[in-house]
């Protein structure tokens, strides 16, 4: 009996072995007895409308859970990992080999769908693999940013999952061989004790910050609207104090008057400078990335030989 095991037997055993550690009966749970276990106002919730439900990343902002203990998004492992199970002729995400290393049904197609919603089609297989990892990081960041910015209402977010037990396309941020995906690098930033967040909706931008340290932190944020040539079209500096273990919405503004008809050629930028000198920059476009009129990069490199 599930309830007997998890709500009577295991709590007693746990308490006998460890008097200090808090016991939670299940996940998701609203406290026990399978009483509306995914209640947004009690306990912890699992959320999969983004990914399984094919909802856009913006849907995270419609949900204010008390604690989101499971949500996720898939990507492919890096090419070195793929090469351990696939020959060059198998390097198509719909090949039998690639689909056999995917245990979530038609998920390779789902990754491609989300890429099409956010980016232009990658030029080759390696680019597609890379973009899938960037997309995974953006997806998880969207949820974490929203829930951290609403600290107090939501007190935690755990993404699914950390790692893999075989080389595969999955929700993991570290692959089977211990190689970090883009998500794991990004998580180090968006889960930082002091972090800034920005999101856009239409021509509106919302700027927030979170402070998980035990001390109040003074913060200066410079908000800019730039065009793709990096010209500054708008600039405003906001100074505030973010209390210990709290979050704050610092600025919400409609930039229609600044953007005008240049929506595809501008973006919002927020530069955060904390009292200890720590800085970070967040940026977001006002249209899907695939619709941005970005400049072609001019990259120059030089090699210098040294003894």
Identify the meaning behind each predicted range.
Residues 1:
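Active-site groove signature of glycoside hydrolases
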Residues 7-10:
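Short alpha-helix
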Residues 12-15, 25-27, 31-37, 42-217:
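Substrate-binding clefts and catalytic carboxylate motifs of secreted carbohydrate-active enzymes
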Residues 209-211, 225, 272:
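Hydrophobic beta-strand positions in extracellular immunoglobulin-like domains
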Residues 221-264:
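Intrinsically disordered, low-complexity Pro/Gly/Ser/Thr-rich segments with frequent PxxP/GP/PP motifs
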Residues 231-232, 276-281:
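Short, exposed coil/turn segments at beta-strand boundaries within extracellular/luminal domains
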Residues 261-277:
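Short, aromatic- and glycine-rich surface loops/edge beta-strands on solvent-exposed regions
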Residues 280-307:
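Edge strands and adjacent loops of beta-rich recognition modules
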């Amino acid at each position: 009996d599930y309830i007997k095991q998890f709500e009577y037997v295991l709590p007693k055993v746990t308490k006998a072995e460890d008097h200090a550690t808090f016991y939670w009966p299940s996940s998701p749970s609203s406290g026990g007895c399978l009483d509306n276990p995914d209640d947004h106002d009690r306990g912890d919730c699992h959320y999969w409308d983004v990914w399984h439900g094919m909802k856009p990343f913006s849907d995270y902002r419609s949900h204010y859970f008390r604690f989101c203990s499971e949500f996720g998004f898939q990507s492919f492992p890096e090419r070195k990992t793929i090469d351990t199970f696939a020959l060059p002729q198998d390097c198509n995400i719909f090949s039998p080999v690639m689909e056999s290393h995917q245990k979530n049904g038609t998920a390779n197609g789902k990754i491609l769908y989300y890429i099409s919603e956010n980016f232009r089609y990658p030029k080759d297989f390696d680019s597609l693999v890379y973009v899938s990892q960037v997309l995974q990081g953006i997806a998880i960041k969207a949820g974490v940013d929203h829930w951290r910015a609403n600290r107090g209402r939501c007190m935690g977010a755990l993404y699914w999952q950390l790692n893999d037990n075989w080389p595969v396309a999955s929700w993991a941020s570290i692959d089977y061989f211990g190689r970090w995906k883009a998500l794991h690098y990004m998580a180090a930033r968006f889960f930082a004790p002091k972090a800034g967040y920005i999101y856009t909706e239409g021509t509106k931008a919302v700027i927030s910050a979170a402070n998980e340290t035990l001390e109040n932190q003074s913060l200066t944020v410079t908000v800019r609207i730039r065009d793709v040539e990096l010209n500054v079209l708008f600039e405003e500096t906001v100074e505030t104090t973010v209390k210990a273990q709290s979050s704050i919405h610092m600025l919400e503004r409609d930039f229609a008057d600044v953007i005008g008809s240049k929506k595809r050629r501008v973006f919002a930028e927020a530069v955060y400078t904390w009292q200890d000198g720590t800085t970070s920059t967040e940026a977001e476009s006002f249209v899907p990335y695939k619709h941005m009129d970005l400049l072609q990069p001019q990259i120059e490199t030089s090699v210098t030989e040294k003894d």
